[in-house]
């Protein structure tokens, strides 16, 4: 079993969501033996990426789980084990999603904000980040990253690209882009338990 006294999981939400998402809440409910942290992700990737790397380091994350946009960020947390569910690797290409203007969060942030604004500069910052997605990869941190892909995801389809980078760490499941509790319960959570128990048994 896990030898560490406290195992920390950081969950990174998707676009338009916040650290108060139902997915983070469900993970905390079903994995009470772990410390589950669910930060609000800054809107601008130029701020978000360094913030998340520092956040994971400061909190000594054992595992980073991300969905959609959060999975794209999770993949870049190179120093940690990562689970990337339906990763939106190229947000700037999702022109029907990432639009200039002011938008409503699905649920308010942990500081009570209900809206966020996308500017042309933010979209350009996504493009800049995307041009360096794999710069920090090496053989060691590749093996610590897994991609989960829903067979009914009609929003993003970067499975083949992910497979080229992280073969053979790709797992397909029956489901769409947005996670539901059934997929969390039957697919993601069992893998989390298996991964953490296997990783720390010998420490």
Residues covered by each model-derived region:
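Internal alpha/beta domain cores that form substrate/cofactor-binding pockets in large enzymes
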Residues: 37-39, 73-85
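Gly/Ala-rich beta-loop-alpha elbow adjacent to hydrolase catalytic centers
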Residues: 64-75
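The alpha/beta-hydrolase serine catalytic core
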Residues: 81-203
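Residue in the alpha/beta-hydrolase core beta-strand immediately N-terminal to the catalytic nucleophile
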Residues: 62-65, 81-83
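Active-site catalytic motif of lipid deacylating hydrolases and related acyltransferases
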Residues: 4-58, 177
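Short, highly selective alpha-helical patches that border small-molecule cofactor pockets
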Residues: 20, 24, 28, 74, ...
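Short hydrophobic segments within beta-strands
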Residues: 11-15, 65, 148-150
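Glycine-rich phosphate-binding loop signature in dinucleotide/nucleotide-binding domains
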Residues: 3-4, 57-60, 140, 195
């Amino acid at each position: 079993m896990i030898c560490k006294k406290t195992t920390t999981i950081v969950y990174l939400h998707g676009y338009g969501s916040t650290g108060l998402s139902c997915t983070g809440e469900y993970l905390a409910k079903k994995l009470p033996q772990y410390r589950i942290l669910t930060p609000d992700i800054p809107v601008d990737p130029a701020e978000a990426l360094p913030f998340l790397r520092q956040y994971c380091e400061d909190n000594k994350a054992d595992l980073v789980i991300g969905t959609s946009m959060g999975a794209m960020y999770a993949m870049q947390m190179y120093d940690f084990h990562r689970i990337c569910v339906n990763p939106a690797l190229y947000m700037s290409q999702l022109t029907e999603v990432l639009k200039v203007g002011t938008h409503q969060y699905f649920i308010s942030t942990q500081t009570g904000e209900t809206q966020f604004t996308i500017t042309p500069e933010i979209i350009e910052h996504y493009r800049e980040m995307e041009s360096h997605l794999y710069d920090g990869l090496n053989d060691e941190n590749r093996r610590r990253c897994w991609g989960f892909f829903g067979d009914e995801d009609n929003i993003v389809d970067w499975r083949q690209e992910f497979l080229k980078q992280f073969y053979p760490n790709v797992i397909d499941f029956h489901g769409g882009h947005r996670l539901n509790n059934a997929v969390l319960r039957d697919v993601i959570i069992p893998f989390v338990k298996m991964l953490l128990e296997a990783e720390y048994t010998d420490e």
